[in-house]
Amino acid sequence: MSRGSGAGYDRHITIFSPEGRLFQVEYAFKAVKAAGITSIGVRGKDSVCVVTQKKVPDKLLDQSSVSHLFPVTKYLGLLATGMTADSRSLVTQARNEAAEFRFQYGYEMPADILAKWIADKSQVYTQHAYMRPLGVVAMVLGIDEERGPLLYKCDPAGHFYGHKATSAGMKEQEAINFLEK
């Protein structure tokens, strides 16, 4: 009774399958798509614009309490696509990290430093058996006095890149194909 070549490797997030896959990371990416929303971010010459869908999962919920766009500081924002609880946890930690950065260095945390911090944190979650990867893709947006508008995308595997335009969520590839035109 064979369970396939990936049998057993999806129970432990720190063990690679024979194909070189971390199933728990793949499940985190699937959780982002399963949230059923798509988010898009576009960087202009003097601005960053992000849009996302707003799906209220229950008729009894207050619509104003459902959001995927969060302020981190006066100059940084975070658009989180994926599991709501993971998003809120990540935003709380990002706000604390940004406040600590400002206290320690005396100036606001740049968007690329926050994106790197989120990516590093996400990558650490793939290394320890007592943690699980967050089911969220975060777009970090900000305006820098020297470099202008910035847009970064961080994923559950710990990757982060700067983008002119990007997308995350259920219709990510379709949105990226449209943005590339």
Model-derived features: positions:
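Long, low-complexity N-terminal extensions
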Residues: 1-181
